[in-house]
Amino acid sequence: MPPTEQGATMNPRDGTDYLPISMLNQWAYCPRRFYYMYVLGEMEHNAPVLEGMLQHERVHAGGVESEGEARVHRRVYVWSDRLRIAGFADLVEVRGGVLLPVEYKHGRMGRWLNDHIQLCAQAMCLEERTGRPVPCGAVFYWGSRRRQVVELDAKLRARTEAAIVQARALAESGALPPPLTHRAKCRDCSLEPVCLPREVRRLREEAAGHGGAGGSCEPWRRST
């Protein structure tokens, strides 16, 4: 039985084990961010997040329309019973019987594996639902005003399936991952005020520098 639209946004602990496709993007970007958003339900809105939400609203308006030889379907709900994932594709273009999922992103074009994994997951859902091969997809980056065509090859598909397994395992583990050491990712993250990556890293370094004295009351006894 296919999941409901609501099921695509629910945590498995709330009664469904269909992982939201958008959360695969978060996991590939930063497992700690994924855990905060998906498991703990944390979400903060900074300027880039709000701009991205407004841009997606513009993309999703309109339903189905024709653009040249292509038929364009907006905000298409997709799912895979095999992979136990579900979510929305911003656009699905149909040209000559070939499907092209298109994802819209706020930032600038680059080799963003997290975006490619999300796109690949959408494509595999479309393949399962329609029985048609989806050889490639595209990501439109608002910051560059350009579309990046992504080949959905065997390597990317394997990475995507591995991401699904690892993201689900992390959600079920109940263990908050450590912060990244990638300063640029942390700087641009809306959850940085909640995650406190610098502070957490500093505390970990201080604890490690005391040779494993953690768990002992001796340092405080010596100070009295």
PLM feature spans:
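Nucleic-acid nuclease catalytic cores
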Residues: W79-G87, V92-A175, L191-P193
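Metal-dependent nuclease catalytic cores that hydrolyze phosphodiester bonds in DNA/RNA
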Residues: M1-P101, C217-T224
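Immediate flanking context of iron-sulfur cluster ligation sites
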Residues: I21, Q166-R187
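Extracellular/mature segments of secreted proteins
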Residues: Y38-V39, C195-E199, L203-E206
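Local cysteine-cluster metal-coordination motifs and their immediate loop/turn environment
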Residues: A184-P197
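Short microdomains enriched in Cys/His and/or Lys/Arg
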Residues: R201-T224
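Alpha-helix initiation and N-capping motif
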Residues: I21, R32-R33, R157, I164, ...
